[in-house]
Amino acid sequence: MAHRPRWTLSQVTELFEKPLLDLLFEAQQVHRQHFDPRQVQVSTLLSIKTGACPEDCKYCPQSSRYKTGLEAERLMEVEQVLESARKAKAAGSTRFCMGAAWKNPHERDMPYLEQMVQGVKAMGLEACMTLGTLSESQAQRLANAGLDYYNHNLDTSPEFYGNIITTRTYQERLDTLEKVRDAGIKVCSGGIVGLGETVKDRAGLLLQLANLPTPPESVPINMLVKVKGTPLADNDDVDAFDFIRTIAVARIMMPTSYVRLSAGREQMNEQTQAMCFVAGANSIFYGCKLLTTPNPEEDKDLQLFRKLGLNPQQTAVLAGDNEQQQRLEQALMTPDTDEYYNAAAL
């Protein structure tokens, strides 16, 4: 494999300082070298264990330290999770992501998590999980169960990180990513824009991600969703152009990674989302609520796809078929139908 040069902070800062139109042009050129610009990967995310998290992430309504009105729930039954996965597949998703509000999974829960992964894979969906810190053995067990992706975000730069989280170190996050990679699972890791960070911090986050031994296959870029009761509830809104700029820099720095629009898409108008796709975003969460924050309704997503001429990307998975792909493509190319949206809203 050819040596991949490491990025420097000054190089990344220069990208952020480029005139926006020049930056978008460069990002779109890079994007077209590695991806079909009309294809977007579609995922659904389910919270399989909600609330009562012992961590103190200042942005998160799931932390037990903040009064956000979120009711804590135990780990969902395996069949409940698989039923949600079936609905996600019927609605057109090709990847099903399962998130649990834990510092780390308990050993007693591992057999259930393995069954969830196996069940999702048996449907022909890609399986992704985000469960907090993992041990080497836990990462290997999930890999053996067939897990495709593991999400563990770095959130922000190492320098700003201590202002947001104190219950888990930055190095712990990097260690988990290494364990996931060593187990043979693809890495999903990104961060959040709007925490109160500077442009230098955004550059520092992307620098960490791009300079990993192997960059993440998937890079979610979140816009802070301000939740009443969390310490960041009164943060300033993120300027749309600043967010688009972050997407473009991520695309240039990690040309073969999927750059995903994740939390915060509900706050974006169609024009902002469209410019994010121009900047190189090529993955979204579709439909179901994004953990505990709103996600645009399916029909709005489909309408936007039609307006922009975008298509959901087909995903080759074991034991799968393309039924969900055909459903979604049909919905994208034809007017809304009761049959499709009843299926999507089940």
Curated annotation (Swiss-Prot):
SMART domains: BATS, Elp3. PANTHER family: BIOTIN SYNTHASE, BIOTIN SYNTHASE, MITOCHONDRIAL. Keywords: 2Fe-2S, 4Fe-4S, Biotin biosynthesis, Iron, Iron-sulfur, Metal-binding, S-adenosyl-L-methionine, Transferase. Gene3D superfamilies: Aldolase class I. It catalyses: (4R,5S)-dethiobiotin + (sulfur carrier)-SH + 2 reduced [2Fe-2S]-[ferredoxin] + 2 S-adenosyl-L-methionine = (sulfur carrier)-H + biotin + 2 5'-deoxyadenosine + 2 L-methionine + 2 oxidized [2Fe-2S]-[ferredoxin]. Binds 1 [4Fe-4S] cluster. The cluster is coordinated with 3 cysteines and an exchangeable S-adenosyl-L-methionine. CDD domains: Radical_SAM. Homodimer. Its cofactor is [4Fe-4S] cluster; [2Fe-2S] cluster. [2Fe-2S] cluster binds at C97, C128, C188, R260. The keyword Transmembrane does not apply. HAMAP family: BioB (MF_01694). It is an enzyme of class 2 (transferase). GO terms for biological process: biotin biosynthetic process. [4Fe-4S] cluster binds at C53, C57, C60. Pathway: Cofactor biosynthesis; biotin biosynthesis; biotin from 7,8-diaminononanoate: step 2/2. This is Biotin synthase. Belongs to the radical SAM superfamily. Biotin synthase family. It holds the Pfam family BATS. InterPro entries: Aldolase_TIM, BATS_dom, Biotin_synth/BioAB, Biotin_synthase, Elp3/MiaA/NifB-like_rSAM, rSAM. Catalyzes the conversion of dethiobiotin (DTB) to biotin by the insertion of a sulfur atom into dethiobiotin via a radical-based mechanism.
